[in-house]
A protein has these predicted regions:
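Surface-exposed, polar/charged faces of alpha-helical domains
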Residues: 59-60, 129, 193
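Bacterial N-terminal signal peptides
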Residues: 1-7
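Histidine-acidic metal/acid-base catalytic patches
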Residues: 12-22, 33-36, 132-136, 142, ...
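Conserved beta-strand positions in the central sheet of alpha/beta enzyme cores
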Residues: 51, 74, 108, 146, ...
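Residue-level detector of anion-binding/catalytic polar loops
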Residues: 48-49, 71, 106, 144, ...
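Active-site acidic/histidine proton-transfer and metal-coordination neighborhood
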Residues: 85-175
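N-terminal pre-domain/capping segments
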Residues: 11-102, 170-174, 200, 267-283
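Acidic-and-aromatic substrate-binding clefts and catalytic sites of carbohydrate-active enzymes
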Residues: 27-34, 49-61, 79-91, 115-119, ...
Length: 283
């Protein structure tokens, strides 16, 4: 049955209401590793959730987050489109049926292949049945699935997410816009047009401080992933543009390889986020 994609929601007006949460990599280099301490830090700083990453730790992490009224906003979830038997961790079914049921979690799938080069649509024939099955499973339990654009992975561009969303053709399946990976591939060109392209399918967004402009294309991660209060890329403008197009989902904070202690990075980034919220209301 064909499904017409609808915008993700009505424009929010003059407020930035999206939930804000850090990626799991905010803690993996220089932060607490225990879920109790992680959840406590996030609650103390005012975040609204966290990203799930380690499937072994996810049940305990979710328990600690839920105790503090925080959410598992997204789960960074690998899918091998070449596999005929077990393309992804089967525990996701049990988790969705139990502690993640009807929480609205978004499974952000990073897609891998050794048979197909990045962005090769010839891999669609292998990927689409896998993604439909995962999407249908998620739908049964109130969850969504978004293609995570990641440089050098099979689905590396936002166009891959858009193409797959059209072909998978499920209401709870869409695309992610990960700022650092988009900048690395496209260098920040034609932002408004690219947001128009992805808006009907947009289910997940991540931001960070970053170098902006044409120099961003092909830049290293130290330039493209910084604390949110640094970098030349205009995140406030970006947030205005995605919310103007109806995006009401969570905003993730990309923190890969940031060398600052987790508390310092997250404190600074939360301060920048609150500044964005204040500037939204002032305009």
């Amino acid at each position: 049955l064909a499904v017409a994609f609808l915008p993700t929601g009505l424009a929010q007006g003059a407020e930035l209401q999206n939930h804000f949460y850090p990626f799991n990599n905010s803690m993996r280099r220089s932060g607490p590793s225990d879920p109790v301490q992680q959840a406590a830090l996030l609650a103390d700083l005012g975040f609204e959730g966290f990203e799930g990453y380690d499937m072994d730790l996810l049940p305990r992490l979710a328990e600690e987050l839920h105790k503090r009224d925080l959410e598992v906003a997204t789960i960074y979830f690998g899918v091998d489109i070449d596999s005929k038997t077990q393309p992804y961790d089967p525990r996701i079914a049990e988790y969705l049926e139990t502690f993640l049921k009807d929480t609205g979690v978004i499974i952000t799938v990073h897609l891998h292949s050794k048979k197909f080069l990045p962005s090769d649509p010839a891999g669609d024939q292998s990927a689409i049945p896998i993604l439909r099955k995962l999407s249908d499973l998620a739908h049964q339990h109130g969850a969504k699935v978004a293609v995570y654009n990641h440089v050098n992975f099979w689905a590396e561009s936002i166009d891959d997410g858009i193409r797959l969303a059209r072909k998978v053709n499920r209401r709870n399946f869409g695309a992610a816009f990960n700022l650092c990976h988009w900048l690395a591939l496209e260098g920040g060109e034609n932002l408004n047009q690219r947001l128009d392209d992805i808006a009907p399918y947009l289910l997940s967004v991540s931001i960070c401080g970053a170098k902006g402009g044409p120099e961003a294309k092909g830049a290293g991660w130290n330039d493209l992933i910084q604390p949110l209060d640094t970098g030349s890329f205009d995140n406030l403008h970006f947030l205005r543009e995605i919310t103007k197009r109806g995006y009401q989902g969570p905003i993730g904070l990309q923190c890969f390889n940031i060398s600052l202690p987790a508390r310092e990075n997250l404190t600074r980034s939360m301060s920048a986020w609150r500044g964005f919220r204040a500037d939204f209301e002032d305009k």
